[in-house]
């Protein structure tokens, strides 16, 4: 089992697409920051907010190209940090998290690390089984060929949040995985980054794991069929696409906000509850933006409670 300590580097790709992405970043710093971890924030383009500061947080400005793949490729090339840490967590700002129940005593990173072992190449929050008829699967097969296991599905850990060990990252660097020079479309980025990453590791004899338990039973080195009948094109991250229901933020820990599987109001209410169990760490400074996010979550939570009471009182008046 991987231990959470100062040999872990958390690499967060931050892009200010809209207010939701800003809130995703602020939520992450508030609830994912731990003094015993190291943080490298890769900023794609510019940052308009006051950036939280701490001795174990480093900011790196990268060219806004090829999404998080491009940012990671640039920072890995420029900083050459791969031998300085034992394990790496990659997170991008399209997701909000971590979300943890108030009774959770475990460091958020341990939820990922507990699934890691010598025969596992990558651990993420979710695994997709993209069908072979999907346009991006066809793009992948055209460029990289079609392995026996990929005739019906193309399994891959989603790249919004995942863990790699030092040995795995070093092997990827050595094999040229991060040597990206041309501009890629969104589909090409999914093909060359998200899909290719997992497929390289599977070809090396390493398996995949994620936080969703149903997806940890198969051996993806040989799996050739869909395991979730309600998945949308192999993706369990949509409404009612996780074995007939919607994944709860506490299960996935990170939620892709653009899909609206959980409303911004609901996520804010969860964040408000979490703030009592996980207060802002005293080691952080320049936290005005985080405090603003905290106040917005509090306002949403308290106003929602007030509205519910008023609605109940309204109907009670007619039923009395």
Roles of regions detected by a PLM:
Residues 1-320:
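ER/Golgi luminal nucleotide-sugar-dependent glycosyltransferases, focusing on the catalytic module
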């Amino acid at each position: 089992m991987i231990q959470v300590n100062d040999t872990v580097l958390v690499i967060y790709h931050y892009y200010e697409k809209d207010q939701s992405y800003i809130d995703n970043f602020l939520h992450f710093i508030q609830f994912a920051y731990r003094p015993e971890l190291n943080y490298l924030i890769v900023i794609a383009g510019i940052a308009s907010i006051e950036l939280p500061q701490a001795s174990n947080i480093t900011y790196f400005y990268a060219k806004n190209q090829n999404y998080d793949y491009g940012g990671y490729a640039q920072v890995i090339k420029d900083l050459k940090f791969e031998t300085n840490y034992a394990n790496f967590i990659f997170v991008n700002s399209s997701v909000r998290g971590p979300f943890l129940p108030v009774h959770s005593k475990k460091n958020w990173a341990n939820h990922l690390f507990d699934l890691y072992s010598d025969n596992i190449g990558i651990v993420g929050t979710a695994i997709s089984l993209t069908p072979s008829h999907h346009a991006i699967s066809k793009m992948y097969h055209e460029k990289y060929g079609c392995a026996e296991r990929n005739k019906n599905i193309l399994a891959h850990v989603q790249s919004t949040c995942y863990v790699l060990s030092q040995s795995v990252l070093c092997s990827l660097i050595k094999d040229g995985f991060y040597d990206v020079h041309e501009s890629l479309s969104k589909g090409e980025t999914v093909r060359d980054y998200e899909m290719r990453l997992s497929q390289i590791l599977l070809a090396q004899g390493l398996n995949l794991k994620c936080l969703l338990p149903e997806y940890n039973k198969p051996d993806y080195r040989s799996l050739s069929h869909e395991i979730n009948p309600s998945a949308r094109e192999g993706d369990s991250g949509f409404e009612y696409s996780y074995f007939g229901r919607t994944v709860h933020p506490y299960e996935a820990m990170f939620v892709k906000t653009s899909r609206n599987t959980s409303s911004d109001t609901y996520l804010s209410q969860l964040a408000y509850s979490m703030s009592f169990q996980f207060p802002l760490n005293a080691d952080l400074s320049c936290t005005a933006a985080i405090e603003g996010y905290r106040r917005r979550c509090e306002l949403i939570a308290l106003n929602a409670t007030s509205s519910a009471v008023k609605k109940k009182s309204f109907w009670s008046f007619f039923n009395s």
